[in-house]
């Protein structure tokens, strides 16, 4: 085709090609496609148009390589088909997902099914082997994953490396982490980092162990230090954190930025529904003054090269024809999207709805904890008052220690909404025998009611927080009856719920419907006094042992920095 000796299978005419190699944008030209690849670019050769050649007139619009989200979490909340309807339809042709949530929820059985769903998804879904399931087995319980099962996932052809491994496990020489790294290095696969808080000698040790990336830069200085050590810098902008404004200026004017990427780390629901996964990130990069072709490279060529996805990530001869035609380089709205040269979407909609991937009935029976009556949430103490240790929120993801004096009634320590002190519980979801720990939480603002969810990071155990034992029981039993999800209760009523029956963490519903139910839960909590804009993010992270300082697990209250259990009653 390039030599003008054969017709193209498809032809895109008058397209401005965004070149991610030299960061130039061409004048309107033609792009010939054949056998799922880009065959030629330039003035149209007479032979390119054959009797069966499909022709698309771009009319001066911009042709980009398909976008690649190099770090996200597609193993909870929604299925991959519904995600594709919003991501692929806007030009996001590939995603690299962590699997830690599914591993914690359902172990190897869930991972095998999720990989089967990924193989059948409309867009390309690559995965990362979950490294530490759970991260700290001495503190917490999850479904678990043996080293043999880890190696099975790592060897999968669509698995590109080891998922984010917390830096203390690496520099402290944790045996599981070292074995995982060695297995991946033997296969030539990447080692994804989670270097939050690591600097200087610790960060160097983390890199020296073989870690290849970090998505935890929260400042320009963080990004510069990681780049200087040879780490790929993945800049987050999504549901959990938004760091482009702080970090992008450090990357914008570098002579060479091949180690830079923009990632969602899980796309914000509203952004995903309105504009797509990486599209809002490209728009923000443009607003921050990044040259459009450079920003596109951060979301295409750079991830492809980093993960060794040869012949992906560019509009160039021989490259896979995963392409998006966008109307402008400010909002990056996609008119057409191709996957391997086949048109898949037009004006933000897939041409064919994705075929539903149906999980077996066992998927909805993974929450195995026993019934949780009100008395399960009673914490015994003598006398009429008790002084307790309290986990206080210090932002969405960090906690600190506080103390409170609480009333004891009939031998049970009560919550005190007047002091903004709730009772909380962390229940092992994997045991038919009741295994749980109780504690107290501050920073929720609830005046009445309770919330419950098992969508907590890494372990996916059941977290409950509330003003009374009866309301905690109602919220927890609602989640248990749904097989997983979110619930808000007050008095004797369930005010809102979001069922997540697949592995206890995924809904089969369309993403907008999942978002609607999550918003119902947020509004219900707001009506009960909770002022948080994202209360369930706080719920997800409140028991997360990967960040400081005080965390409640199913085994007890943990001081993460001191690396020991501490007493609730003082």
For each predicted feature, which ranges?
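Active-site neighborhood of phospho(di)ester-bond hydrolases with catalytic His/Asp-centered motifs
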Residues: 64-70, 97-100, 128, 163-165, ...
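Short acidic, glycine/serine/threonine-rich loops at helix termini
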Residues: 106-110, 136-142, 173-178, 202-206, ...
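Divalent-metal coordination cores built from histidine and acidic residues
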Residues: 6-7, 84-188, 495-499
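Histidine/acidic residue-rich metal-binding segments in metalloenzymes
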Residues: 144-163, 169-235, 242-262, 273-287, ...
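Metal-associated gating/positioning segment near the N- to mid-region
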Residues: 44-49, 53-117, 470
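Short, ordered loop/turn segments at secondary-structure junctions
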Residues: 43-44, 99-102, 130-131, 167, ...
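Active-site microenvironment of metallo-dependent hydrolases
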Residues: 1-29, 33-39, 44, 90, ...
């Amino acid at each position: 085709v390039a030599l003008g000796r054969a017709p193209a299978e498809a032809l895109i005419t008058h397209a401005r090609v965004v070149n991610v190699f030299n960061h130039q944008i061409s004048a309107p030209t033609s792009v010939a496609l054949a056998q799922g690849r880009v065959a030629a670019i330039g003035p149209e050769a007479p032979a390119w148009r054959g009797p069966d050649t499909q022709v698309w007139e771009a009319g001066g619009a911009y042709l980009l390589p398909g976008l690649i989200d190099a770090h996200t979490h597609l193993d909870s909340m929604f299925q991959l088909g519904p995600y594709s309807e919003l991501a692929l339809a806007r030009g996001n042709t590939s995603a690299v997902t962590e699997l830690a949530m599914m591993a914690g929820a359902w172990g190897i059985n869930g991972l095998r099914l999720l990989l089967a769903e990924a193989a059948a998804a409309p867009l390309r879904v690559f995965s990362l082997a979950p490294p530490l399931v759970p991260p700290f087995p001495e503190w917490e319980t999850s479904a678990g994953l043996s080293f043999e099962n880890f190696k099975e996932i790592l060897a999968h052809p669509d698995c590109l490396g080891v998922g984010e491994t917390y830096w203390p496990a690496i520099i402290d020489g944790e045996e599981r982490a070292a074995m995982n790294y060695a297995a991946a290095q033997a296969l030539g696969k990447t080692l994804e980092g989670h270097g939050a808080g690591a600097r200087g000698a610790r960060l160097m040790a983390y890199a020296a162990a073989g870690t290849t990336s970090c998505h935890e830069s929260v400042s320009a200085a963080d990004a510069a230090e990681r780049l200087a050590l040879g780490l790929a810098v993945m800049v987050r902008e999504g549901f959990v954190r938004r760091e482009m404004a702080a970090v992008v200026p450090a990357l914008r004017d570098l002579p060479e930025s091949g180690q830079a990427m923009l990632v969602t780390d899980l796309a914000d629901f509203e952004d995903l529904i309105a504009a797509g996964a990486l599209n809002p990130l490209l728009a923000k990069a443009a607003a921050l003054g990044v040259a459009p072709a450079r920003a596109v490279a951060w979301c295409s060529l750079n991830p492809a090269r980093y993960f060794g996805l040869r012949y992906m990530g560019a509009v160039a001869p021989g490259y896979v024809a995963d392409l998006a035609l966008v109307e402008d380089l400010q909002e990056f709205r996609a008119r057409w999207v191709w996957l391997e040269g086949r048109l898949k979407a037009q004006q933000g909609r897939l041409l064919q709805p994705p075929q539903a991937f149906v999980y077996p009935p066992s998927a909805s029976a993974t929450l195995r904890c026993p019934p949780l009556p009100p008395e399960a949430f009673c914490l015994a103490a003598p006398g009429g008052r008790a002084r307790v240790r309290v986990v206080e929120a210090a932002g969405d993801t960090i906690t600190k220690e506080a103390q409170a004096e609480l009333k004891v009634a009939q031998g049970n320590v009560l919550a005190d909404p007047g002091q903004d002190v709730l009772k909380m519980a962390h229940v092992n979801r994997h045991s038919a025998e009741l295994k749980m720990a109780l504690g107290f939480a501050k920073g929720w603002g609830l005046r009445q009611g309770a919330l419950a969810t098992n969508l907590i990071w890494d372990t996916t155990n059941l977290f409950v927080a509330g003003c009374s034992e009866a309301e905690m029981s109602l919220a927890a039993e609602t989640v248990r009856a749904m097989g997983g999800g979110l619930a808000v209760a007050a008095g004797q009523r369930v005010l809102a719920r979001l069922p997540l029956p697949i592995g206890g963490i995924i809904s089969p519903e369309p993403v907008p419907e999942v978002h609607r139910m999550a918003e119902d839960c947020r509004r219900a909590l707001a009506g009960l006094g909770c002022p948080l804009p994202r209360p369930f993010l706080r719920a997800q992270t409140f028991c997360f042992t990967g960040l400081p300082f005080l965390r409640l697990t199913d085994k007890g209250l943990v001081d993460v920095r001191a690396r020991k259990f501490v007493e609730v009653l003082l």
